[in-house]
Amino acid sequence: MEKIKEIIVVEGKDDLKRIKESFDCTVIETKGFALKIETIKLLKKALKYKGIIILTDSDKSGNIIRQKIVKYLGENNKIKHAYLNTKDTEVESVNKTEIIKILKGVGTLSKDNQKDLLKLSDLLELGIIGENSKENRQKIQKHFCLGDGNSKKLLERLNYFKIKKTDLKNQLALTNSPRRT
């Protein structure tokens, strides 16, 4: 499966599934009109790092969400826009071939070195996922501006931003060390 360098921004979880069927990539959902502060911070970070591709439904709602994202992030040449070919179409209902064609037209295909990527076992070992891990996971998500999400989303975002195991260890050591008064 081909990999896209930029983060792809979509409206909902069904859109995310449709994109993931076609590409190995990081996808962020806006979850509709109400963009959370965490989502905006994550998009700003992605914009500095590798850029984003906005792919929303081709209806009025999709255009409003697209405009909101640009408003919050500002005009930037690292914001790429992908558009569906048919008016009033939802991303989730577009066939895989069209999704591939659209995203290949605006995205940057890449080949990441898989050996340097974190694994779920690394996060488990560090106490970021698994039993009694919620506090550590939230500290990591907040410090690295990764937004909320389950274990798989966290892992995907850590790898997207090339955050290393040593970075995680160091941050946990800092945040978990007793404070002096």
Swiss-Prot record:
Keywords: Cytoplasm, Endonuclease, Hydrolase, Magnesium, Metal-binding, Nuclease, Ribosome biogenesis, RNA-binding, rRNA processing, rRNA-binding
Keyword Cytoplasm: yes
Record InterPro entries: RNase_M5, RNase_M5_C, TOPRIM_dom, TOPRIM_RNase_M5-like
Residue sites binding Mg(2+) 2 per the record: 57, 59
Chain sites annotated for binding Mg(2+) 1: 11, 57
Family named by the database record: Belongs to the ribonuclease M5 family.
Identification of the protein by name: Ribonuclease M5
